[in-house]
Structure formats: C-alpha cells, structure tokens
Regions:
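Amphipathic, Lys/Arg- and hydrophobic-enriched alpha-helical face
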Residues: 3-24, 37-41, 99, 103, ...
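Amphipathic helix-loop-helix modules that constitute alpha-helical solenoid scaffolds
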Residues: 73-129, 133-287
Length: 381
C-alpha cells in the first residue's frame, strides 16, 4: 500500500466532493472512510484509476451518510445523485480546497490549521504539537473552522493572495514538535504551483526555498541564533538556493511583480554573496523600495532601515529608522544594531537589553541578552 499516493490524492478527492455540493465536514468524513476502505481493499485488488476509485467510494459514503442522517436529509435537494458530467481537472479540485481552507471568514490561525489538516493531511495531534497547544484545543479550532466553511460554495476563483499568506504563515513556524512545518509549507506550495499559474505562487515558492537553504546555518550547536552576517555559508543548501533563484527568474520575466517576488529577490541577493561583505546592499535597498511601494508595510520599512544602514552607513540607517513608530516589533533591536555600528556602544547595550525584554521568543531573547552582555563587557573599566 502506497501511503504517499493516498496522501497526495486526498486534497483532490476532497475538492471533488466539495465542488459537487458536500459541506466540508461531511466531505472530509466521507473521504476518510474511503481511505480506510482503500487500505483494506487495494492490497488484494489495486485499482487502475486510484483517484477515480477514491472519488466514487467517497461520494457513495457521503450519499449514504446524507440519507441515513435525518438532520442532513434537507441537504439532498442540492446534492446530485450522479456526478455532473465532465468533471473538473484534478488541479481545479485541489485549488478549490486551498481557497476553501483560506476562506476570508476564517481567522489566520484557523486557516492555517484547516490547511494543514485538509490539504496537508496532518493529524490533529501533529498540528497541536507543532503549535504547542493541547490536542483538544486544536481539535476545537479545526471543528470551528469546518463549521465556518460548511456550505460555502466556491463558484468563482478565490483570492490566491489569501492562500499564499496562509502558506507563508505555515512556513514561518519552521520546525516544531514532530512536524517540519517549513518543509510541509514548501510541499504544499509546490502542489499549489502545479494547480495555478501565477507569478506570486512562484515567488512564494522561491522565497521559501531561499530561506530554507540557510536553515542549517541559522543556529549554533547549542541552539542559539546565528545572525545572517555570521553564518557559515558553506552550510547553506546550494541546490535549494539555485532552484529558488531559477524559479524567481522565471517569475520576474513575466513582469507582474508582487510582494513575494520582491522578498525572494532580496533573499536571492543574500544567496548570491559568497561572504557577508560582498552583499549588494544597494540593490537590496532598491528592492525594499519596491516592496514598500507594493505593501506600504511598516515592517518592510523597518527592514529597509537595516539595509540603508549597510549601504549608506549606520547614521543613514538611524535617520530612516527615526521616521518609524518606535512601538514596531524589533524596532529597538534594529536601533541597537545601528547604534553599535555607529560606535555608540553604551546606547547599543542599553537598547539590546531593552529589546531582549520584549523579544517574541526565547531564542531571540537569549540572543539579544548575549549581545547586551558582550557590549557591557567591553564597556567595563
């Protein structure tokens, strides 16, 4: 029994049932029942068309459940007994499921959980462990998400940008518990790229690959963070970086620039530099200008201030930083870095300590605390 085949077919089969009129929760139950039957039947009698077999089995189980449950009987009027002629391509069914899981009515956290459950095929326990919450809490979150999208009919294409933002949230969780969420996000984005031809899908995939390429060098053996400038670039995954750059170049050639392509271009410039000193910061500032134009995001402008500090000197970076809200996350850490670059070590040490107090996670807090301690050691008479 090829479990990877079943996992790869599940989103498309689920998408078929939703397209035919099944609500999400009922469709998922039917597909799970069909998968159980496949595990039992296929070893002795493998089907010629695995997806067709699963669709037929799941559809029958859905109809049986609909007929047998009086509370669901009212839905029969809008469910055809036979599948409509001319089924949509598998890619369309998978894509519809992505749109459903990233529906605007869902909170970002619920969209992420539902995407991992329905499209990624992860168990509720795996998702709960990845997000460090009790399994019961995650089960409730997923159940609420299913109820929210039940009955939603996606007769028109959904918003690709919403799906991409959901996948990027998954990617940014990195690795937690027994699930490599970054690798899972890359897998799902690859799957999405085969279903929809959009340069921003390619841009996101390129961005993920370029960031993932640096993963092995991001932490020291003791688990502490290693800043980009100090990373051992020989530990970067050159194959993943090259793939990301190739995907990005093809996307940029279509001349439909979007925010993920711009972010990937910045990551590509870092990947191109053999050493931190060879980084083309002038081009990076130009790409941040494009990204700021596309998003008008204060976080982008914060990162731009860092790049300006590298391209034009720390005082120019501090001038760019002065125009931003000091309450921005990581504003104080950026200010500390720029003050250190400018030679103002007492101010930098104080700001590193302050930034550590407000750090969003333990790894960053420890890193900023070490930076403050390092400078304070130099300042002692």
């Amino acid at each position: 029994m090829d479990e990877s085949l079943l996992r790869s077919l599940t989103p498309s089969v689920l998408g078929v049932l939703v397209r035919r009129g099944a609500d999400f929760a009922a469709a998922e139950d039917a597909v799970q029942d069909a998968l159980v039957e496949a595990v039992r039947v296929w070893p002795a009698d493998p089907p010629r068309d695995p997806k067709g077999w699963l669709v037929t089995a799941a559809w029958r189980k859905f109809l049986d459940a609909t007929r047998s449950d009086a509370a669901r009987r009212r839905r029969e009027d809008r469910v055809d007994e036979e599948p409509p002629p001319g089924p949509a391509p598998a890619a369309d069914d998978t894509l519809q499921l992505y749109f459903l899981c990233a529906h605007p009515s869902l909170t970002p956290a619920s969209a992420v959980a539902l995407t991992l459950r329905a499209v990624g095929g992860l168990t509720t326990r795996q998702i709960a462990r990845a997000y460090l919450v009790p399994e019961a809490t995650m089960a409730q979150r997923i159940s609420r998400a299913k109820r929210t999208v039940s009955g939603v009919r996606l007769d028109r294409p959904g918003d690709v940008a919403t799906v991409l933002r959901t996948l990027y949230l998954v990617f940014n969780e990195g690795y937690s518990g027994d699930v490599d969420l970054a690798a899972e996000a890359i897998r799902l984005t690859r799957q999405l790229s085969s279903a929809v031809d959009h340069p921003e899908v390619a841009g996101l995939l390129a961005l993920m690959l370029l960031h993932h390429a640096r993963r092995a060098a991001r932490t020291a053996p003791d688990g502490s963070l290693v800043p980009l400038a100090e990373q051992d670039r020989h530990r970067w995954d050159t194959r993943a970086a090259a793939e990301g750059i190739g995907i990005l170049q093809a996307a940029l050639a279509r001349d439909r620039l979007g925010e993920f392509q711009a972010q990937a271009a910045i990551a590509a410039l870092h990947a191109d530099a053999l050493t931190a000193e060879e980084t083309d910061w002038v081009q990076i500032v130009e790409w941040y200008d494009e990204l700021a134009r596309l998003t008008d995001s204060p976080v982008v402008r914060l990162n731009r201030a860092v790049a300006v500090g590298e391209a034009d000197g720390p005082h120019a970076g501090l001038a760019a930083l002065a125009a931003l809200d000091p309450a921005l996350p990581r504003h104080t850490a950026v200010a500390a870095h720029l003050h250190e670059r400018a030679g103002d070590l007492p101010t930098a040490a104080r700001l590193y300590a302050e930034a550590a107090h407000h750090a969003p996670n333990l790894a960053e807090r420890n890193h900023l605390t070490r930076q403050a301690a390092r400078l304070n050691t130099h300042l002692r008479p």
